[in-house]
Amino acid sequence: MSYIEEIYGREILDSRGNPTVEVEVLLEDGSMGRAAVPSGASTGAFEAVELRDGDKGRFLGKGVLQAVANVNEVIAPELEGLNPFDQPAIDRELIALDGTENKGKLGANAILGVSLANAKAAAECVGLPLYQYLGGVNAKELPVPMMNILNGGQHADNNVDIQEFMIMPVGAKSFAEALQMGTEVYHSLKAVLKEKSLATAIGDEGGFAPSLESNADALLAIMDAIQRAGYTPGKDIALALDVAATELYRDGKYHLEGEGLTKTADEMIAYYEDLVEKYPIVSIEDGLSEEDWEGWKKLTEKLGSKIQLVGDDLFVTNPARLARGIKEKCANSILIKLNQIGTLTETLDAIEMAKRAGYTTVISHRSGETEDVTMAHVAVAVNAGQIKTGAPARTERVAKYNELLRIEEELGETGVYPGHEALGR
């Protein structure tokens, strides 16, 4: 048995040039785990708190020296000497040290960094890749990628209201083939946009962010790109949306400012029904606001048997909010973001609860990412079946895809790529 010898936190930069927390956990035998914490742009009101310094004279107030100090001065002395293999006990200790509902005292960024680095140190100590350490012999399902290839909303400076237009290579036979298909469509989309004299600058997650007239224009451009790449929309490559509707919600209405429209929840649902009828859309994330439980119930009644309805801001990876959603029959899928709840154990608990209720799970990055690939391992460890980690561009996104290629190679014939089945409908 090797115990925790040292825990060390530092401030590094994420993909948006903002500071974030990185933590190293060192064990007595020399094993070391390192984890860097991501950060979101469109954040749910019910997420665990990311601690920022607020000192405007340093990184425009976005420094994380306080969170780093909490790792080094508060957490480290309490955890050093403990058993790293008892992840639930480590995470319980972290939660108790913080003592708040939302991890606002020490910061979810400090807590998650320690939680993940600890699991990675333990995995290294026993000579296992993280996915196998967490998931055992049953960890064998590669996730279908949801590739965000066209951006609007909070992730881009343009007039498209829907935040993410994604492609899912559901017709692929392996993860490697899925990555190839998605990448070919991505390059094809660039050519389509260039022909229309539209911008091919990329957003936070690697997707293009052209100024289009409407959401329908975005969908048509992607359909064109899929066909030009030699694939059949729906059969080979399906479409998925992240509306991030909480960002559009004010005074009980949804404001689609790019299109100059204001809609009620019922009108939004009718709008989605129309889109699903016209395009091969298999998944809609955050179609309604995180506060609009009644609307979510109706949306699920109308579309829940046809497509995947993913709760992100609605659930914020929180078992208590997920339990309410299950009880009230809201959504049929949960987006899992490690930093929304703040510890690995709570994340795994949320995934377990979702699976028991028949909800699908999608492991997700944040718009502010790092080269850390922990989420790729978590996706395989829990057989999530789906991963959302951006376009096949920008190293912090591609790092996750490349790690999944390595994992698929390592799994060999035991590895499974679920394709259409990942959606569970």
Swiss-Prot record:
Binds a second Mg(2+) ion via substrate during catalysis. The active site is at E205, K337. Its main location: cytoplasm. It is found in: Cytoplasm; Secreted; Cell surface. Pathway: Carbohydrate degradation; glycolysis; pyruvate from D-glyceraldehyde 3-phosphate: step 4/5. Belongs to the enolase family. Catalyzes the reversible conversion of 2-phosphoglycerate (2-PG) into phosphoenolpyruvate (PEP). It is essential for the degradation of carbohydrates via glycolysis. This is Enolase 2.
